[in-house]
Amino acid sequence: MIKNYKLLLFTTFTLFFITFVSGSSILKANFYYKVDWENVQCFVPPCPKYTIQKLNTNEKSQKILDFIFPNGLNKTTLLGDESKTLIVLGTTQPSSKFPNNATDFLVTRVYKSLPLGNKQTSTDKYYMFGDNGTRCKTSPCPNIVAALLNVHSQEIINTISQPYEKNVGFLDSVWLSSKNIRSDDFGLIGQGTIKNGVISISNSFIYLPDPPIKCPELPLLKCVEGNSMTYSRDENRCLVSPRCTKFGVCTLSIPLCNKGYRLVSFPSTELNGCPKFFCDPEFVNKTHK
């Protein structure tokens, strides 16, 4: 009886998760696409410079004139050559400028690849990940659902292996790990290959905007002499838990960030008021200095 109930619970979750990641919970016409761009020159409009390719399929690519993005996104990181780093969820529609001979793309969600991933392999596919509810006393534990985007197919895996902690200095591993497995819309898309229960990610695509929620406003504390305001940083890169901390002895070394990343710091409670440094992707919103 208990075994059958667990099987029913797992099956129900699985069906829900496949529906969620396929985009059919929004509109049946919504699919995930990789974007490409070429700076072609045309003598007569319209002049579509973008193409989209439906993920995990062999369908023919489509030419796109314009993208219609949701409000609140920094479009300078999304258009032109930058668009080659995007995955978009949405649907095509007739162009507002040339309805009879051009196509626009109405974007529901947009994801951008983290710089300095690994070179993609011929076996890589695109996945999103969920928790299947399995709990184990030993590891590895097969508790991760890897759902193939645009395809009603999935695999159960035990490990998500990211390349970025090796490739990028001072990356916030808590921030990245929090995006691997989510129950909301804000999880990452992983391009990778599954073997023996492990997916080796070549590139991760981050949901935009990031963070997806507004950081909380913090009170301004009055600290006694010899103390200063310090913080922690949560999985959304927001400063939290302000407190007065006695000054510590700080090192003077300041790290350099890899290309595509910017240096940020904050007075850390963990480091007794000394600055804690991270290298955040340049395309995410700043949450502090």
Swiss-Prot record:
GO CC field: extracellular region
InterPro entries reported in the protein's UniProt record: DDB_G0275255-like (IPR040405)
Leader sequence residues: 1-23
Keywords, ordered alphabetically: Glycoprotein, Secreted, Signal
Localization in the cell: Secreted
UniProt-annotated glycosylation sites, renumbered to this chain: 74, 101, 132, 285
Superkingdom as given in the UniProt entry: Eukaryota
PANTHER family with a match to the protein in the record: DUF6748 DOMAIN-CONTAINING PROTEIN, DUF6748 DOMAIN-CONTAINING PROTEIN-RELATED
Name recorded for this polypeptide: Uncharacterized protein DDB_G0275255
Organism whose genome encodes this protein: Dictyostelium discoideum
